[in-house]
Amino acid sequence: NDWRNAMYPVVPGHE
């Protein structure tokens, strides 16, 4: 997502 990316940057094991 976009808003998620803003709060949660590319984190390992996100999706």
From Swiss-Prot:
Superkingdom in the source lineage: Eukaryota
Q: What else is known?
A: On the 2D-gel the determined pI of this unknown protein is: 6.4, its MW is: 38.8 kDa.
Q: Which family does it belong to?
A: Belongs to the zinc-containing alcohol dehydrogenase family.
Q: Please identify the protein, giving its name as recorded.
A: Unknown protein from spot 159 of 2D-PAGE of etiolated coleoptile
Classification lineage: Eukaryota, Viridiplantae, Streptophyta, Embryophyta, Tracheophyta
